[in-house]
Design a protein with these regions (language model features):
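Hydrophobic/small residue at the entry helix of a nucleotide-binding pocket
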Residues: 13-14, 38, 402
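Helical element adjacent to the flavin cofactor pocket in flavoenzyme catalytic cores
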Residues: 183-233, 240
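Glycine-rich FAD pyrophosphate-binding loop
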Residues: 23-47
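Mid-domain catalytic core of redox enzymes
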Residues: 225-334, 338, 342-343
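Conserved flavin/dinucleotide-binding core of flavoenzymes
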Residues: 308-418
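Short beta-strand to alpha-helix junction loop
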Residues: 57-64, 140-141, 152, 188-210, ...
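Mobile amphipathic helical/loop "lid" adjacent to a hydrophobic cofactor/ligand pocket
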Residues: 63, 67, 71, 76-176, ...
Length: 418
């Protein structure tokens, strides 16, 4: 293609949404992606007929921007049951949303996961987080999530047996130092909609977005070495020019391209996928570890959500470990199997390890203060813009929003009508 109007560095969700908004306004785009495919962290690998999402991820269907940008019907979404199965003191306890699963309300109320008062406060928390608009959440007084939960009146019991393992699996932060604003936003999204997986894996989300761009708009295997005046230089020396450049990469890579040394620290995770013949749990619930044991924090069985995640007659188990582990794959597999045999019995020894994912930058640290993702967009220069998690909060919702807003800033800078 001839020189595009806009060069976008990175074909993750932010970059793709930015490109689509630019195309809607008649601007030509070229996305340069260093890896071999679109999606950024939202990728799925196919191994021996199994679909392995790169790190445990779900689509929260209440995300407003996802509702605007995605065709849920075409994604063929499959849903987790609302709630969790919590491992505590050698037993499993069902902890479900009584408003969605009234038949399980009594079991949840009588479980040792929190007091009766705690469970009543969860209803109050749901009401609190669903008040006002999303911008309102990011204007409320900010604290750590742990401080917020304690101030709300929750006991140490429910904090340690539910909130800590659950939120550790969401934000990869055992200390619950994540901003209370992020917690309120996340809790609102979980309570307002479903947690789902596309039938063909999380990769279906970026692939759906990419399919709406003209052929030739995306170039993979194109790593950008540096940003130049209204253009970029690729590794290998090729220079590409446009009227504007948008950097839509992960935070550390964006900082590198901008020449900034003050890089926001990251939260890492390790994920192990196993194949098995019989699922260790009977229904599509998230399993949370409230015993404080190592290494697994949470697990799920994606095939109970969407059978297409595995070949016929087999099941897939996805485990999540907080942080990146230094052990080799065999040693880590042994640790995980030993732990899970205590949960599910000796049959775990027959599970077959499919792959280990070590993701050092699973999310940026999101401790207070966090930026308001609804604030007016600020460009870096008259022709250079950023979007995604760089100096912003991280979630699928805000990745999409930041891409759209970056595109609108570019359109205004290039004097195009919105």
């Amino acid at each position: 293609m001839s020189s595009p109007d806009v060069i976008i560095v990175g074909a993750g969700l932010s970059g793709l949404c930015c490109a689509l908004r630019l195309r809607e306004n008649g601007l030509s785009v070229l996305l340069l992606e260093a890896s071999d495919g679109v999606g950024g962290r939202v990728r799925t690998d196919q191994v021996d007929g199994f679909l392995l999402d790169r790190g445990f991820q779900v689509l929260l269907t209440a995300y407003p921007e996802a509702q605007l940008m995605l065709d849920y019907g075409s994604l063929n979404l499959r849903y987790f049951s609302p709630g969790a199965l919590i491992r505590y003191d050698g037993h499993f306890y069902r902890f479900v949303d009584p408003l969605r699963r009234p038949k399980d309300a009594l079991v949840t109320m009588l479980s040792p996961i929190g007091t009766i008062g705690d469970k009543m406060r969860i209803a109050l928390l749901r009401r609190r987080t669903r008040q006002g608009t999303l911008p309102d959440i990011y204007r409320r007084r900010e604290a750590t999530t742990l401080q917020y939960l304690k101030k709300f009146g929750f006991s140490e019991n429910i904090i340690n047996r539910f909130f800590r393992p659950f939120l550790s699996g969401v934000y990869f932060d055992r200390n619950l130092d994540v901003s209370s604003r992020m917690f309120e936003f996340g809790f609102r999204m979980f309570s307002a909609g479903g947690a789902a997986l596309p039938a063909c894996g999380m990769r279906a989300i970026p692939e759906q977005l990419a399919s709406r761009l003209p052929e030739g708009s995306i170039r993979t295997g194109a790593r950008v070495q540096s940003v130049e005046e209204r253009g970029v230089r690729l590794v290998g020396g090729e220079v590409m020019k446009g009227r504007a450049v948008v950097i839509a990469t992960e935070g550390p890579e964006t900082a590198r391209l901008l020449g900034e040394k003050d890089i926001l620290p990251s939260r890492g995770m390790t994920g192990l996928y196993f194949a098995c013949e019989k699922p260790p749990i009977p229904e599509p619930l998230l399993v949370l570890n409230a015993e404080g044991s190592e290494p697994v924090n949470n697990l799920c069985v994606p095939t109970l959500v969407s059978p297409s995640y595995a070949p016929h007659g087999e099941h897939l188990v996805a485990t999540t470990i907080i942080g990146t582990r230094d052990e080799g794959d065999e040693a880590l597999e042994a640790l995980v199997k030993t732990q899970l045999q205590g949960w599910f019995g000796p049959g775990v020894e027959k599970w077959r390890l499919l792959r280990v994912y070590r993701i050092p930058h699973a999310l940026p640290v999101q401790a207070p203060p966090v930026s308001d993702p609804t604030d007016p967009f600020v460009k870096v220069s008259p022709w250079l813009f950023t979007c995604g998690e760089y100096r912003n909060v991280a979630s699928l919702q805000w990745a999409m929003v930041s891409g759209r807003r970056a595109a609108e800033a570019v359109i205004q800078a290039l004097n195009q009508p919105l």
